[in-house]
């Protein structure tokens, strides 16, 4: 499901939601809310803040050290620079919903 499909899912009046608040969102409001949440998560992660939303999951930054790798095409050795890797770890409610 892409972003547009997810916004439609959030505002679908025929969908069986547990919470009535989902049914009151317009597509424009849903898009604004989603953009606000995503931009806030990106901004917090960019500032090296971890985000933990109980039950949903956590967003963290993991630092990856510089290392030596190989070009898969030629087999030549190459240096891979250090970088920060954003990660998401699902919470208990998210895991339970998937199983």
Curated annotation (Swiss-Prot):
Record-annotated disulphide pairs? none
Membrane-spanning ranges: none
Q: Look up the record and give one Gene Ontology term from the biological process aspect.
A: chromosome condensation
**Which UniProt keywords are listed?**
DNA condensation, DNA-binding
InterPro entries (UniProt xref):
Hist_DNA-bd, Histone-like_DNA-bd_CS, IHF-like_DNA-bd_dom_sf
What Gene Ontology molecular function terms does this protein carry?
DNA binding; structural constituent of chromatin
Q: Quote the Gene3D superfamilies the UniProt record gives.
A: IHF-like DNA-binding proteins
Give positions of region: Disordered: 67-86
Which SUPFAM superfamilies does the record match to this protein? IHF-like DNA-binding proteins (SSF47729)
Quaternary form? Homodimer.
Q: Can you tell me which family this protein belongs to?
A: Belongs to the bacterial histone-like protein family.
What function is annotated for this protein? Histone-like DNA-binding protein which is capable of wrapping DNA to stabilize it, and thus to prevent its denaturation under extreme environmental conditions.
Q: Output this protein's name.
A: DNA-binding protein HU
Which gene is transcribed and translated to give this protein?
Answer: hup
